[in-house]
Amino acid sequence: MIDTKNLDSHTPMMQQYLKLKAQHPDILLFYRMGDFYELFYDDAKRASQLMDISLTKRGASAGQPIPMAGVPYHAVENYLAKLVALGESVAICEQIGDPATTKGPVERRVVRIVTPGTLSDEALLNERQDNLLAALWQAPQGFGYATLDITSGRFLVSEPADREAMAAELQRTNPAELLYPETLQDMKLIEHRRGQRRRPLWEFELDTARQQLTLQFGTRDLNGFGIERAQLALRAAGCLLQYAKDTQRTSLPHIRAVTLELQQDGIVMDAATRRNLELTQNLSGGGENTLADVLDRTVTPMGSRMLKRWLHMPTRDITTLTYRQQSIRALQDHVAELQPLLRQVGDLERVLARLALRSARPRDLARMRYAFTQLPAIQALLCGQSEPYLPQLLDRVGEFETLRDLLARAIIEAPPVLVRDGGVIAPGYHAELDEWRGLAAGATDYLDRLELREREKTGLETLKVGFNAVHGYFIQLSRGQSHLVPIHYVRRQTLKNAERYIIPELKEYEDKVLTSKSKALALEKALYDELFDLLLPHLAALQQSATALAELDVLSNLAERAETLRYVCPTIDARQGIHISGGRHPVVEHVLSEPFIANPLTLSDARRMLIITGPNMGGKSTYMRQTALIVLLAYIGSFVPADEATIGPIDRIFTRVGAADDLASGRSTFMVEMTETANILHNATHQSLVLMDEIGRGTSTYDGLSLAWASAESLAGRIKAMTLFATHYFELTTLPEKMEGVVNVHLDAVEHGDTIAFMHSVQEGAASKSYGLSVAALAGVPREVIKRARQKLRELETLSTGAAAGSVDGSQLSLLQPEEQPVAPAVEALENLDPDSLSPRQALEWLYRLKKML
C-alpha cells in the first residue's frame, strides 16, 4: 500500500513519482530514470506479469520496500506494443531537466499517453488495418457514435436508431478503444468489446462538446459540417476529441473536419450479415479466404485500409459508382506501370499523422521525400485521360516540388532512426551547423599532428594520442618510459602496462571539441523542429494528396483484379431487380482447384422470391452468398465475377445463414436464428436483398416448417423483398402455386447407386428429393445405419404423404402450442385393451361397448 497522504515521509524522487502517478491512477506510468523506464509499487507488480519482466525492489521509502520493474529505453516500443495488444494504456514520463545542472530530482513530465485507440507509432500498429478510437452515447431516442482514426484525422459520427443498428456499427468499425459514459444502461452491448474506457458524465455534455469541436475546427458553429442538430452524435464526438487531446498532449492539426454518416448513403448490413459474408474476417476469426483476402492486392497500406472501408460501407451514390467504374476501366491499361510507383509512396497517410503530432522520425521525413519523387511520374503516366474522375484525383495528388526540394536539402539520404543522436540534417543545409560539425570532425587530423609533434619533442617513439568516452583525450606511454615524460605532463590514468597523461593544450582542445559536438546536436534538433514548422502549413494539401493516392491504389488494384480474375463491369440500374448471367462466388472460385460452376440469377417484380431446394453440399449456400457478394462488389464500384450483371436499387443486405449457440449470452442456436429472423422481418423493405438459409431447422419439424412458411409468406407478400429462401422443407415448394412473385429453383445432383454427384448447377423448378442419406454416406456414416435409415425413410414417406402441405396452408399460423384436445373415452379404452388376452365372446362384447362410447 502506498502512503500518499504524507508525502514528506518519502524521498524527494519518490515524492515526484507519487505526484505524477496520482494524476494517472488507472494506467501504467513509465518513469524515465537514466537509460530505463521504471515502474513502482502496484504498477511494477502488474507490469512484471503482463510483460514477463523481473520484479525487484528499490530500497525503501517511508519505511516501506518499493517493488520495482523496468525496461530499457531503447527497447521501449517492443514493450509498449505488448501492453497495447493486451488493452493497456501507458503514461510516458520523460526527464525534462538536465541532471548535470539540476539540484535535487531532475524535472520530469508526462509527455504522451499511449492507449490502444490513439497509437500513431508504426511499430505499434497493424499497417493494413484501421485503428479507431470510438465513443458511444445512449439516450431513450437512440445512440450517438463517433470514431476517430488519429493516424489519418478521419473523424466520423453517426446516430444509430436502435440497439441492432448500434451493434452493427460496433461490428463494422471494430474500435481498438471504446469510451462510454458511466451511466450507460445497455452494458451487454459492449461487454465483449476490447479497450473499454468508462468516462465521467460531464465529458459528454452537449455545450462542452460544441465548444471543443468549434475550437478544434476554428469555426463559430457546426452548421457547415451538418451536425449542429445531431445532438447524440455531438455528445460522443466531444468526449472523444477531449480524450484524444488529453492523451496526445499536443494540438491535433490534422483533425480538420467531422463528417456525419447517414444510413441512407450506404447499403446497410447488420452484424450477422457482415459476419456471414466473411468480408474481412472469416467465421473462425482469421483473415484467410475472405472477400478482402481475394480482392486486396493494393500496394500501399493506406490503400488496403481504404478498400476494407469500402467493403464494409458500400455506397448508394450512383455518381460515385460510375466514376469508380470508369476509372477502373481506364486504369486497366496502366496497372503494370502505376503499381510500382504507388508502392514507393508507402504509407504517406500515417507519416502525415506523425508529422501533425510532431512525433515524426527522420526516416518518416525521408519516406515523405521519396513519396514526393514518385508524384511527377504518376502525373505523367495518367495525364490526358478522357474519363472525368482521374483528372480530379490527379489534381488532388499534386506534386509538392518545393517540399521535395526542402527535404532533399535538409535530410541526408539514409538518416538514423532517431534525431537525438544527430547525423540527420544534411551537410550544406545550415552554415553554423557545418561549422560546429567541422570542429568535431577535424579532431582526427589535429590529434595526428599533435602526436607527431610530441614524439619529436620528447623523442619517445611509442607515444600515442587517443580518446575514450570516460576520460576524454589523453597521451599514452608505456610504463617503462613513464620516467622520461616532460614535467608539464599530468597523469590522468594508470593502466597495467601504460600511463595516460593530459597536457594543457590537449585539455583546451578537448573542451572545444566537446562543446562543438553538444552545440551541433542542439542546433540539429532545433533545425529538425523547424522543419516541422515549414511542413505543417501544407498539411491539409498533403492529407488530400494521401487520400487521393490511396484511392488511386484501390482503383488500380480493382483494375488488376478485374483483369486477372475475369470480372465484368456491372450495370447499376434505377429499375428494381437483379439480373446476373454466369455469376461466380469470388472466394470459393479462388480456392477451388477445379473449375467453378457459374450460375444465373434473376429477381424482378414478377420474380421476387426464389425457393431454393436441393441436396446438402449441393451449393445452395454458395449460390446465395455469391449473389450478395456480387451485389456488394457492384456497390463499391468494383467489377464483379459474372459474365453479365445488372443490379437495381438495394438499401440493405440481410443474411440468415447458419447459426451456432451464443453461449456467452445464454442463447441457443434456435434463439439466435429467431432473433436474426425477427430483425429481418422488422427492417427489410422492398429494396432489400434477403438471404434465408434453412430457417426453422433448430426446432421440431412442424414448428420449423410453420415458421419457415409464415416467414416466406411475409417476405414475399407483405414486404416484397428480393429474397433467396433455401430450405429442405419440400412443402414450401407449393408456395409458388399460392403466391405471386415466388418461383422454385433447385441445385442439381445425380445419384449412382449409393453415391451422389453434385452438379452445382441451378435449374428451374423444385428438387425431386433431398439426397440427405447419400450425403450422410459420403460423410462416412456406417453402412448399416444408412441401410436402416433408408427403411425408415420409406415408412415415414408412406405415413406422411400429403399431410404436411395441408398442415401449413393458411393465412396465419400461431407460433404458440395449440391447446391440447381431451382424449376420447373410446380411444382411452382401446389404448388400455390387450386384444391377445380376449376370447372371441369378450372381443365382441368390447366392440359393442366401444360403439356406445362414440
Curated annotation (Swiss-Prot):
The keyword Zinc does not apply. InterPro entries: DNA_mismatch_repair_MutS, DNA_mismatch_repair_MutS-lik_N, DNA_mismatch_repair_MutS/MSH, DNA_mismatch_repair_MutS_C, DNA_mismatch_repair_MutS_clamp, DNA_mismatch_repair_MutS_core, DNA_mismatch_repair_MutS_N, DNA_mismatch_repair_MutS_sf. The keyword ATP-binding applies. GO terms for biological process: mismatch repair. SMART domains: MUTSac, MUTSd. Keywords: ATP-binding, DNA damage, DNA repair, DNA-binding, Nucleotide-binding. Gene3D superfamilies: 1.10.1420.10, 6.10.140.430, DNA repair protein MutS, domain I (3.40.1170.10), MutS, connector domain (3.30.420.110), P-loop containing nucleotide triphosphate hydrolases (3.40.50.300). ATP binds at G614, P615, N616, M617, G618, G619, K620, S621. Pfam families: MutS_I (PF01624), MutS_II (PF05188), MutS_III (PF05192), MutS_IV (PF05190), MutS_V (PF00488). Coiled coil: none annotated. One of its GO terms (molecular function) is damaged DNA binding. It comes from the Bacteria. GO terms for cellular component: cytosol. This protein is involved in the repair of mismatches in DNA. It is possible that it carries out the mismatch recognition step. This protein has a weak ATPase activity. Belongs to the DNA mismatch repair MutS family. HAMAP family: MutS (MF_00096). This is DNA mismatch repair protein MutS. It comes from Sodalis glossinidius (strain morsitans).
